[in-house]
Every structure is written in structure tokens, then in C-alpha cells.
Amino acid sequence: MSEKLKFRLPTAEDAAEYISYRQAFLDAGSSMDGTGPMRRTPDPMEWLAINAQYADPATVPEGKVQSTQFVCERVSDGRIVGMLQVRLALNDYLLHYGGHIGYSVRPDERRKGYASWMLAQGLDYCRSMGLRKVLITCLNTNEAS
């Protein structure tokens, strides 16, 4: 992969990119894995607030787990090409269906190596947070993963 990427936390400055990223998935009828409640949250500021709630162990909703949301930005044009969410624990649902890491690449940016690069960054973050074993799940129909 020749593109330079940034793996970082989302900010309010990403609002236009958030809207574009979300719409690309809706238009493609594609799953928004690793984006938290993006599908049901059209407002980027609301999405950021929800991510902040889940990032703080004191405010995570009952039955949910602490998580950290990341975006993958292509440096050359500032475009968000992917998103990845790290869950710092597993509940019953995540143990069977979601795992510690969920991620997605914008439909028109797939097959460029972005997912592999993001996953490596996500695993580094997991190690930095003390996770020694990480569960990643995938549907059988997801040939790229």
C-alpha cells in the first residue's frame, strides 16, 4: 500500500466526512461494521457523543462494553477510508457475533490494503490496553476478510 494513512480518534472536524462515509454504505447496502451506532445516527455530533459515552467506563450503558472508536484517514486528501472499533471486553453478543474488533472500509475504497493496515493498528491498540487475546469474527460470506 503506497498511501499514507492516519489511525486516530474521530473529531467534530470529521462531520462532513462522517456524512459522506455513512451515505456511501447506505447507497451500497453495505454493513457498517466497526462504526458503532452509525447506521441509526445520521447526526455526526450525536455519534461523537455516543462514542464518548462508550469510551468512559463510568458512562457505558448497562449491558454494553467500553469501546474506543477510530477512523482511518487518507493523508493525501483527508478522506475517511475506514473505521475500526475496539471493544475492551466481551458481552455474550460480542463473544458470538462481534468480537473485540469491528471494522469496515468505505465501499469504493476496498481492496487497497486499508483493512489489513487498520487491523494492525487496532491490534497494537489492544496490546497497549492490556488485551492479550483478541477475538475477531467474520461472516463466511466476507471473502475479503
Where are these regions (language model features)?
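Conserved acetyl-CoA-binding loop-helix of GNAT-fold acetyltransferases
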Residues: 102-105, 111-128
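Conserved beta-strand-loop-alpha-helix junction that forms the acyl-donor binding cleft
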Residues: 110, 136-145
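Short aromatic/hydrophobic contact patches that present stacked aromatics
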Residues: 6, 102, 135-137
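GNAT-family acyltransferases
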Residues: 2-100
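Charged catalytic carboxylate motif
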Residues: 17, 118, 144
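Short coil/turn motifs at secondary-structure junctions
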Residues: 89-91, 108, 141
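Conserved GNAT acetyl-CoA-binding A-motif
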Residues: 126-137
